[in-house]
Regions:
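Loop/turn-to-beta-strand initiation segments
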Residues: 7-9, 58-62, 82-85, 119-125, ...
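Conserved interdomain linker/interface between the two RecA-like ATPase lobes of SF2 helicase motors
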Residues: 152-213
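Post-DEXD/H (motif II) to motif III coupling segment of the RecA-like Helicase ATP-binding lobe
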Residues: 79-80, 84-85, 92-156
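Conserved Walker A/P-loop ATP-binding site and its immediately adjacent core
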Residues: 5-30, 36-42, 46, 65-70, ...
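Conserved RecA-like helicase motor-core motifs
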Residues: 31-42, 150-156, 203, 222-237
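C-terminal helicase lobe
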Residues: 194-260, 264-335
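Conserved helix/coil segment N-terminal to the catalytic DExD/H
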Residues: 24, 42-85, 93-99
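Catalytic P-loop NTPase motifs of RecA-like helicase/translocase cores
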Residues: 18-19, 69-70, 93-102, 133-135, ...
Length: 335
């Protein structure tokens, strides 16, 4: 579309790490240089440079977070060019995140309707590997309704990962001496160090940024080469360096939140450890799916489970906040 018609494809992507990973892979592995992203990790100058390259036709595949797409006039990105397609990557987030975590996802349908009223016409492609189809939890048709897509073509594939097994260890809190959270941190750290000592790459998910920082503070400075941390509040240069070193194998273990998650393709991760149960089943499937992307590897999903761990799920579900204008729009939908 870009070469023949000078059209721009916009990809709505949920995570900075995912945007960076996909743009890098397109360039490095497929020789596609027209892709770029704009996100909060970039400086004003870097953003302006990407927008300039879109305007001049040097770039034609643009990755954006929904928050930026909904709060910026579309033509400021396009510079007179037209949209050829909108791709919503990890489309299950429209419903699973839009209602309780990142409410801007819930308003993508309104954005599509507005652009249609403005005379713009383009196909919408939704991609996900974790959406339930049919039944009580029908994410596929729920997403179609939320986006107002109308008549659609649905392609279903097999997403079962036979090369991931599960290691679930249930613990009795009565056997723990001291604070439970401290014991859980030590269990997780012990696992991480053991896997790294065996030369096996490992990823550990935590519900909160504070827990990532806390466990990172427990390791010595000498261990900072092999063990890294990743969450949304870490400065952009450090995040980018961590992404690169983890892919290349300089770093072998990563403490992270879901900011490093869905779609990120690091082929040689053998172990995915959960400090506690994640927010939703879709989130969990996405997170353990980081293991064994190379199908020749047998991946393992681990969790040291305590009955009180469900408090994290309840807490995460209550964290999200909606802006005033979103509350007004939501009331319009309901009424």
């Amino acid at each position: 579309m870009a070469e023949k018609y000078n059209l721009v494809t916009i990809v709505v992507s949920p995570l900075i790490a995912l945007m960076n990973d996909q743009v890098d892979q397109l360039r490095r592995e497929h020789g596609i240089s027209i892709a770029a992203c704009i996100n909060s990790s970039m400086s004003i100058e870097e953003r302006r440079d990407v927008i300039s390259q879109i305007h001049t036709g040097q770039k034609s595949l643009l990755y954006l977070a929904p928050e930026l797409l909904l709060t910026t006039h579309l033509q400021s990105f396009l510079g007179g060019r037209q949209v050829g397609m909108v791709v919503i990557d990890e489309a299950h987030t429209v419903t699973s995140w839009g209602r309780d975590f990142r409410s801007d996802y819930w308003f993508l349908g309104d954005f599509l309707k507005r652009t249609s009223r403005d005379g713009l016409s383009f196909p919408v492609l939704c991609l996900t590997a974790t959406a339930v189809y049919s039944g009580d939890n029908d994410v596929v048709n729920d997403t179609i309704r939320e986006l107002g897509l109308g008549k659609t073509i649905i392609h279903l594939g097999n997403v079962k990962r036979s090369n991931i097994s599960f290691d679930i260890q249930r613990h009795d809190p009565a056997q723990i001496v001291g604070r439970l959270d401290d014991a859980k941190l030590n269990l997780t750290l012990k696992r991480m160090k053991a896997y790294i000592a065996s030369g096996e790459k490992v990823l550990a998910y935590f519900p909160y940024r504070s827990q990532v920082d806390q466990i990172y503070s427990l390791i010595s400075s000498a261990d900072h080469i092999k063990l890294r941390r990743y969450h949304g509040q870490i400065p952009s240069p450090e995040r980018k360096m961590t992404e690169r070193d983890y892919k290349e194998g300089t770093a072998m273990g990563l403490f992270c939140t879901k900011a490093f998650g869905m779609g990120v393709d690091v082929g040689d991760i053998k172990h995915v450890v959960h400090f506690a149960p994640t927010g939703t089943l879709s989130d969990y499937v996405q997170e353990i799916g980081r293991a064994a992307r190379n199908t020749e590897i047998q991946g393992i999903a681990h969790i040291d489970y305590f009955p009180s761990d469900l408090r994290y799920v309840r807490s995460l579900n209550g964290i999200s906040e909606m802006r005033q204008y979103q509350l007004r729009e939501m009331l319009k939908k309901i009424c």
